[in-house]
Design a protein with these regions (language model features):
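Surface-exposed acidic/polar loop and edge beta-strand patches at domain peripheries
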Residues: 1-136, 142-177
């Protein structure tokens, strides 16, 4: 079985894209985000946190003024791309909009619209192994402003209680992280 990609409805998250092979699946939000809201081996629980009750949000005058009136940030859960250093409200972008995507083989590319207020555009490129459980996520941030910006990309994963994430580290003795 090669990698299969199809649109599905996934709980409170609405329209999502499911990528799967014979061993695992991941689900990416399309009505908002993008967030990798589910990663699981077949027959096993999702290792990602899902804020199905919408318990973690941020809003208020700072959000209205910086982003747009009525802006509300939701954690949603799962894996997302964040700007660092963390700053309120700038890094709490309310990513509540539909996400365009393309599928090419075992890779999906998700390109949400430019962030209002921040003037950056995030791009996710997710590749799922055809015969394994490894998902490779490449993040790109484009500065769409006329002025330079100083920030770092932060791939942030919110895991379910007891979840374990393995993150590769540098294998050369540089004396740095």
């Amino acid at each position: 079985m090669s990698v299969q990609c199809k649109e599905i409805q996934y709980g409170v998250y609405g329209r999502c894209l499911e990528m799967s092979n014979k061993l695992c699946r991941l689900v990416v939000t399309l009505d908002k985000g993008p967030h990798i809201i589910c990663y699981q081996l077949h027959g096993e629980p999702n290792v990602m946190h899902e804020d199905r009750e919408d318990a973690t949000t941020q809003k208020g005058p700072d959000f209205d003024n910086y982003f747009y009136p009525g802006a509300v940030w939701h954690i949603y859960g799962g894996h997302r791309l964040w700007l660092s250093p963390e700053s309120m409200p700038e890094t709490y972008y309310p990513d509540n909009f539909a996400v365009p995507y393309t599928v090419e083989g075992n890779t999906i590319t998700l390109t949400p619209k430019e962030q209002e207020g921040n003037h950056v555009q995030l791009v996710f490129r997710i590749t799922l192994e055809e015969n394994g459980t490894k998902a490779t996520i490449a993040h790109t941030i484009y500065n769409r402003d006329t002025a330079p910006k100083t920030f770092a990309p932060w791939g942030l994963s919110v895991l379910a209680p007891g979840g374990v994430e393995i993150v590769p580290q540098a294998d050369k003795p540089t004396g740095l992280l």
